[in-house]
């Protein structure tokens, strides 16, 4: 529950990916002319023009599914984090026993003890499997499900705590679909050859996990078949990923009696009592899915349900157990699904888990090392210029009524901005890291950390929301907009070259992180964010005629992206990616306007490397999204990720943006040219 699944759907983010390879410190931000491919005209393919040189000389590391600017910066940040974490571990004077930084260092150190993990074998997970074996009848399933939530597990559905969508000042309980092993509903339901193959591979994967847990081959194969069939039944009642983008559909408050009518097997009052969750109402994101859980429990035998629950435990545990489990998890989830040939080295895997569970303890050290105060001050100035530019845009819109403009400007005026790191650091005082030879294991500490975060969230139920909290750690190379807080958050981790350098040319900064800032701001006004008001509540503030015009513009933009074909027969899903695509176009637009405001304040700079400020702006925009992907990673992204492939995140918005046409003299006949009537202009 460090970042709830349903909340992740609602929050707009810039990009999700992992990193690898030996880090090189990012160069001082600017336009690297060696990355340009002069054989490509910018008017035809700006992505290849700006990045062609880089694409030609870059090989995706064997332990990565894709590689780009985000990965390169993550590599650099990984090295910084590892360095400061090791220093903390060695300095018992500054970080004595009981301090959060000592806990982070100990968590990492125990995770790195591969001999300890190998010697433990299956022992760390046996108590969880024993709990499943002890379920005597179906009336006891709810008890296991509740206890499983308390250790961060998921089966049948997810229980989460975050602000009430319609009363964002109060924390609420949510139940959403979950507890299946494939990434998304369509993996279970599509009937094309690749989807069928994936399900077969998944069945083999589950069988292998059962064999590693000690089952005979025949029993393991039979169990895997049962698991796939049961999960498929659950998937049939899930909302599509496009439907999940509608927060109105996800908001279905139910009192206990209503919940018992939907899914009686849970025994909701007792379930909440075990969780010590003081709630008499739960917001159900997918009532039909919850009904499907009830039907599955009735239709399947207790033994089959136990088999499903065991598979969920083994899937979750595998990355933290002995090598054979880790390898099996990698072979299916990363190698097969994403096409990555090589596993990340252990230190990177353990560091990522340490960051997930003790991220702010590490973040405090990272900020001291890598984020000076001046960097925060200049970033805040940039945010203000871009916000003002957006306000100007709203005032001049010819398709929006004055009443809706008034509400939009009111929402923008209440935007909260978090830059760099939290004002108040999270305390991990209640987290126990086992270090004694009798108790210590990597998996045990993962469970302890997960349990700490779950209980930390549950105890907030019914209480006022603490808006000072962050949903990303300071070292994260990403950013987000949270509609429930009406805030944008930019961690120190992404406020680094090549995205941002407080010492560098502002045209490049505005084209880089500035476009990202604009992207996140405008998430508050995309197909999801536009349904929340300035207080963060799910509330329509649009005139109906304006909403119809907005949707029509969005439909036209979605249709453009649906025509892109990254792989043969595999098209971008324009409706699914619409929010992020609007964010890219709008972010580009208001960042460009924000740069013009900066020039009025500070003067217009000269050419650099014979490039005008506008050319540098656009080239920086093209640079930050440079990415090479393996086909399987790209396929997985298209199926599960609301972000479009990198080439379209560049060429798509630019082909609709008039200043790009003016700067690079794009005319009819050029590949990026669109007739004026076809260009989408939303903000």
Predicted features and spans:
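Intrinsically disordered, low-complexity linker/terminal regions across diverse proteins
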Residues: 5, 227, 262-265, 283, ...
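Sec-dependent N-terminal signal peptides
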Residues: 5-13
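Short secondary-structure subsegments characteristic of cysteine-rich extracellular domains
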Residues: 10, 63-85, 219-237, 509-515, ...
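C-terminal motif of bacterial Sec signal peptides marking the signal peptidase cleavage site
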Residues: 15-17
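Bacterial Sec signal peptide processing site at the extreme N-terminus
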Residues: 19-28
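Active-site-surrounding "flap" and adjacent substrate/cofactor-binding loops of secreted or lumenal enzymes
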Residues: 25, 38-44, 49-116
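Hydrophobic/aromatic-rich, well-ordered segments within soluble, folded domains that form packed cores
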Residues: 35-56, 192-211, 578, 585-590
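Noncatalytic, helix-rich "gating/capping" subdomain that lines the substrate-entry/channel surface
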Residues: 88-385
């Amino acid at each position: 529950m460090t970042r709830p699944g349903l909340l992740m759907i609602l929050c707009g983010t810039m990009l999700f990916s992992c990193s690898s390879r030996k880090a090189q410190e990012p160069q001082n931000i600017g336009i690297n002319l060696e990355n340009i491919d002069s054989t490509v005209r910018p008017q035809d393919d700006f992505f290849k023009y700006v990045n062609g040189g880089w694409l030609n000389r870059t090989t995706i590391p064997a332990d990565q599914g894709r590689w780009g600017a985000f990965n390169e910066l993550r590599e650099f940040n990984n090295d910084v984090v590892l360095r400061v974490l090791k220093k903390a571990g060695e300095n018992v004077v500054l970080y004595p026993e009981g301090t959060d930084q000592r806990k982070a260092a100990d968590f990492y150190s125990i995770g790195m003890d591969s001999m300890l993990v190998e010697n433990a074998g299956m022992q760390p997970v046996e108590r969880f499997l024993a709990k499943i074996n002890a379920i005597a009848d179906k009336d006891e399933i709810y008890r296991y499900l509740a206890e499983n939530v308390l250790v961060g597990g998921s089966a049948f559905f997810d229980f989460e705590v975050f602000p009430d969508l319609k009363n964002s000042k109060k924390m609420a309980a949510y139940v959403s679909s979950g507890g299946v092993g494939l990434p998304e509903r369509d993996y279970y339901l599509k009937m094309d050859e690749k989807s069928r193959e994936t399900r077969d591979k998944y069945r083999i994967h589950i069988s292998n996990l059962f064999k590693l847990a000690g089952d005979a081959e025949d029993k393991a194969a039979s169990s895997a078949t049962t698991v796939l069939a049961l999960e498929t039944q659950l998937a049939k009642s899930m909302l599509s990923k496009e439907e999940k983008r509608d927060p109105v559909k996800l908001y279905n408050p139910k009192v206990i009696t209503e919940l018992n009518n939907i899914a009686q097997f849970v025994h909701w009052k007792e379930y909440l009592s075990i969780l010590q969750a003081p709630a008499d109402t739960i917001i159900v994101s997918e009532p039909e899915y919850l009904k499907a859980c009830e039907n599955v429990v009735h239709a399947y035998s207790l033994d089959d349900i136990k088999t499903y629950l065991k598979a969920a435990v083994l899937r979750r545990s595998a990355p933290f157990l002995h090598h054979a489990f880790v390898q099996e998890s990698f072979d299916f989830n990363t190698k097969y699904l994403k096409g990555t040939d090589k596993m990340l080295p252990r230190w990177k895997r353990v560091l990522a888990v340490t960051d997930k569970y003790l991220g702010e303890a590490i973040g405090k050290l990272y900020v001291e090392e890598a984020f000076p105060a001046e960097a925060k001050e200049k970033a805040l100035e940039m945010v203000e210029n871009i916000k003002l530019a957006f306000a100007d845009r709203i005032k001049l819109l010819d398709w929006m009524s004055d009443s809706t403009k008034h509400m939009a400007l009111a929402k923008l005026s209440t935007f909260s901005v978090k830059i760099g790191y939290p004002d108040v650091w999270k305390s991990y005082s209640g987290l126990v890291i086992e270090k004694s030879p009798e108790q210590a294991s990597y998996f045990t500490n993962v469970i302890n950390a997960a349990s700490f975060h779950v209980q930390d969230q549950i105890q907030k139920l019914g209480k006022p929301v603490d808006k000072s909290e962050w949903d990303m750690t300071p070292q994260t190379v990403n950013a987000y907009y949270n509609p429930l807080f009406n805030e944008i958050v930019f961690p120190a981790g992404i406020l680094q070259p090549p995205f941002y350098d407080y010492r560098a040319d502002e045209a490049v900064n505005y084209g880089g992180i500035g476009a990202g800032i604009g992207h996140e701001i405008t998430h508050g006004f995309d197909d999801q964010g536009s349904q929340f008001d300035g207080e963060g509540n799910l509330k329509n503030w649009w005139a109906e005629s304006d909403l119809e015009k907005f949707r029509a513009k969005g439909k036209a933009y979605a249709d453009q992206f649906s025509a892109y074909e990254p792989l043969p027969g595999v098209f971008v899903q324009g409706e699914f990616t619409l929010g992020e695509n609007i964010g890219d176009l709008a972010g580009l637009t208001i960042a460009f306007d924000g740069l013009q405001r900066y020039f009025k304040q500070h003067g217009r700079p000269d050419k650099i490397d014979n490039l005008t400020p506008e050319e540098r702006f656009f080239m920086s925009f093209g640079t930050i999204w440079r990415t090479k992907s393996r086909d399987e990673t790209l396929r997985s992204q298209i199926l599960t990720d609301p972000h479009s492939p990198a080439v379209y995140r560049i060429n798509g918005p630019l082909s609709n943006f008039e200043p790009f046409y003016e700067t690079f003299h794009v005319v009819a006949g050029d590949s990026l040219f669109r007739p004026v009537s076809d260009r989408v202009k939303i903000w």
